[in-house]
Amino acid sequence: MRRLFAVALSVLIAACSSAPPTLKPLPTLDSVPTVSPTTVAAPATATPLPTVAPLPTATPSPDSVLCPLSGLPVSKSVLATRRPLMVQIGNSGPERPQFGLAQADLIFETLSEGGITRFSAMYLCQDAQDIADVRSARLINLQLIPIFDAILAHVGASAAVLDLIERDIRIRDSRLDYFRNNPGFTLQPERRRPPFDVFTNTQALWDAARSRNVPMPGNPVPEIKTSSNVPLNGINVRAVTIHHHSSYWVRWKWDDEASVWTRHISSDVNAAGDVPHLDAATTRVLTAKNAIIIRAQHKQTDIIEDTLGSRSQNVEITGASGDAIFLRDGQMFKGKWKRDKLNEWFTFTLADGKPYELRPGNTYVHFYDLESLFSPIDVVAR
């Protein structure tokens, strides 16, 4: 049943006029765990891995420029007609496998209520013919949207989060909300049972934004620094596991042949095992060129997100800094993250203080609680 909740991480408060949670200085950060070849035992029963198709090599054209979100070639004339999209995508059991994650340039994964995460998927340089299922906005959107001047596509939000959205004119005037009867969304109950049946696609959202006279292309998009050169002093790893919750974790496994990280999630059948996280359209395992783990303070708020009374969390990533783990090219790098202003991208540095650059391609960013009560980040070395 669709209705507004009064907002889950990834973020009905007593009064809709409440101000957003005040950012507080982060406490001293825990150190990044030391790599141990035996930190995580291999699953007792390995799940066969779906075939990973090699990604096509992009061929630059005279009109080609580098996508600011991925560092891959894209048409300059195409970028001139677009503004970044940030689509809220669910990640509970009935919502998997999702549509459209494989086409996102950049994905943020944030812990939500019920011990599960929610995705904030960024689209700019790739087209997605199906994106589902679209879900409600969270506090984290208010911190991420200003970085890219993005168009938020969502299905409502709690009263408190909607109030905060209305206070930000730039977000308010460009967002696309299914519950406001904005165009760009379709119900497809034959493909997914309600309330997980709200679909969209990138072209429909850009067309809907134009119909509402949303400025295109918007403010300049920050360029995320990428390089084909692998940084020095990385640690060769076979797998890295991120415990977002006691009942849900993500494991990135390195596929040397395809030169990508393959995404796996906790199994509902085998507590120690994992299953491939698949793309609904292709039935192939989701992959990434980069994964970034940002350790940040998570503060519980008084915003109620669901009928069970689950409370939203505020992830303190503005005016803050902390430890980070970077994954690329089959290696793990320890480093730091920093972000001073709401409209700024993160500054990433390696342990030696040198700037960290991502590998060209798609990226997943995990926000990991600094004071997690669950297992630490586990690493299996090669």
Language model segments and positions:
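Ser/Thr-rich, Proline-interspersed low-complexity disordered segments
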Residues: 16-67, 72
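Hydrophobic core
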Residues: 11-14
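Flanking scaffold residues of small Cys/His-coordinated metal-binding clusters
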Residues: 8
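A surface/extracellular/periplasmic glyco- and lipid-processing/surface-interacting theme
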Residues: 61-106, 113-382
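Positively charged n-region of N-terminal signal peptides that target proteins for export
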Residues: 1-4
